[in-house]
């Protein structure tokens, strides 16, 4: 248990970090800290490391260098030193460095998790609830640090990073705590006890687009159900994962229960998926990468949970409020620079109202300010040069295949020569055979398709290899519900409903398998055991 005095020291040190604009804290590639204001550094050391010299401090800095992994409750050097530059997508400058792990680092983390599982799996619901409460308390202290890291690592505007990206982290923690308190782990049916037990060591592989959201919606239910774990965050956006790890360490997560190893997919990700002592792999990312995870996991017949790509339809029914529905649809696609797997990227409108819809979409897209994510812009950059090139190529492909360029288009926005910025783009008169209607673009690009009948709209919506999400807007509630019930997607949003963290999240078809969020997420981390004769009386 962390004492109140330690929490006070930590809060004071965090404030000192925020207030000091004179710190010189760039770490060199060996992980040693450069000189800075001594008092602030001493305070940071006292609160953040508990006297341990191997704790990587997080503070206001010109360069974030995170060169150690978190294994068995300690910050440790990689077995084979190797570093990677992390690029700020708004400036194209190096923002920091991380160490890249190896299969040997993964094995050390898995062995620590395996040892910890023996005791943590036997912890009580009350003990795990208390742990989640401590994590939530620590997260509140570090909320703004998390948000700032997300802005720097993947370009989310400050407001989005604070109010959505970082907020989702605490939302999933609170949801897991709520579910845990009432969750039924065992039930007697006749003389047979049906018991749900933690599955074991979990390998968690998370993406860069909603970094803490995806970490939290895996780690929180894993902790709540009594599992231990090894996390590999995206090497493209790793800063927020480091702060997340500091939060768990400060909250007193038992040694070995949570472990962090940075690295890339082909090395660290593959080692996690194929490790014989990992019992479950939970992966969020592209369908292509998900296939590799499943292939690596197959020889050990472990459980594989995946949340993959999407090409979500957004049906606007003939009796819908067209201005409201189109406006909401455009803004939803452009949110987070289009880098959301459940973005409603295929808007279906009645063909006779196509021109009206295009005019509304153009006005909304052109009203979105693009620019420095720390300056109040509505949309920041996409995450990397590779993503920028892919998005630009697909925009050009859409135009070549006959789509009408309604707004945006190829090239960077005017005045934004530095940074991976994309114009908010709307393509009209798209048909479902076009490349832009089939492939996940993962950028701020909306395709608008026309339909003649509601039956045709449903057929177009379902004509995709994906099935993560779908959206329907309509005026008559029962008719709108009937359309929603026929869409082949894991989550269907009716008339712009608010997010629900208790609602299961996951996909049909090539969008993955299994479910995250809320009570349904717990089942992914549990095995079911039947104990026959448990309730029988003695002969």
Predicted regions and their residues:
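Residue-level signal for inorganic ion chemistry
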Residues: 92, 128, 150, 173, ...
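Short, well-ordered beta-strand elements within core beta-sheets of diverse protein domains
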Residues: 95-101, 116-122, 169, 204, ...
């Amino acid at each position: 248990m962390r004492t109140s005095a330690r929490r006070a020291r930590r809060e004071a040190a965090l404030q000192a970090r925020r207030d000091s604009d004179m710190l010189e804290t760039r770490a060199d590639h060996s992980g040693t800290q450069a000189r800075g204001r001594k008092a602030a550094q001493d305070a940071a050391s006292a609160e953040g490391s508990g006297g341990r010299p191997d704790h990587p401090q997080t503070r206001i800095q010109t360069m974030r260098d995170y060169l150690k992994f978190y294994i068995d409750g300690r910050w440790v050097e990689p077995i084979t030193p190797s570093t990677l530059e992390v690029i700020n997508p708004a400036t194209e400058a190096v923002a920091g460095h991380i160490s890249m792990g190896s299969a040997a680092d993964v094995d050390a983390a898995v062995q620590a998790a395996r040892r910890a599982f023996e005791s943590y799996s036997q912890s009580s619901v009350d003990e795990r609830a208390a742990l989640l409460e401590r994590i939530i308390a620590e997260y509140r202290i570090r909320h703004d640090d998390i948000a700032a890291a997300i802005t720097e690592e993947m370009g989310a505007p400050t407001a989005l990073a604070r109010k959505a990206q970082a907020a989702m982290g605490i939302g999933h923690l609170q949801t897991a705590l709520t579910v845990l308190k009432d969750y039924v782990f065992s039930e007697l049916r006749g003389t047979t006890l049906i018991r749900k037990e933690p599955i074991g060591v979990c390998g968690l592989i998370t993406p860069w687009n909603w970094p803490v959201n995806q970490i939290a919606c895996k780690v929180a239910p894993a902790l709540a159900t009594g599992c231990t774990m090894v996390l590999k965050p995206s090497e493209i956006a790793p800063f927020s994962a480091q702060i997340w790890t500091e939060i768990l360490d400060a909250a007193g997560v038992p040694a070995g229960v949570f472990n962090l190893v940075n690295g890339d997919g082909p090395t660290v990700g593959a080692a996690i998926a194929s490790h014989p002592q990992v019992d479950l792999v939970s992966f969020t990312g592209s369908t292509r990468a998900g296939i590799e995870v499943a292939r690596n996991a197959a020889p050990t017949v472990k459980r594989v949970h995946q949340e993959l790509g999407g090409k979500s339809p957004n049906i606007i029914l003939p009796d819908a409020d067209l201005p409201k529905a189109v406006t909401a649809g455009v803004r939803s696609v452009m949110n987070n620079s289009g880098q959301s797997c459940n973005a409603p990227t295929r808007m279906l409108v009645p063909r006779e109202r196509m021109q009206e819809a295009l005019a509304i979409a153009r006005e909304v897209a052109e009203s979105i300010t693009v620019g420095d994510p720390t300056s109040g812009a509505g949309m920041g950059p996409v995450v990397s040069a590779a993503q920028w090139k892919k998005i630009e190529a697909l925009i050009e492909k859409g135009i070549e295949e006959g789509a009408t360029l309604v707004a945006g288009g190829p090239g960077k926005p005017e005045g934004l020569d530095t940074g991976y910025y994309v114009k908010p783009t709307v393509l009209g008169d798209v048909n479902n055979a076009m490349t832009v209607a089939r492939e996940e673009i993962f950028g701020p690009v909306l395709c608008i398709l026309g339909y003649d009948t509601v039956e045709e709209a449903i057929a177009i919506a379902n004509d995709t290899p994906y099935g993560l999400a779908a959206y329907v807007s309509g005026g008559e509630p029962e008719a709108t519900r009937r359309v929603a019930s026929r869409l082949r997607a894991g989550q269907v949003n009716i008339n712009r409903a608010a997010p629900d963290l208790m609602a299961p999240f996951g996909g049909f078809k090539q969008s993955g398998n299994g479910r995250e969020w809320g009570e349904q997420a717990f089942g992914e981390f549990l095995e079911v055991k039947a104990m026959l004769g448990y309730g029988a009386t003695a002969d």
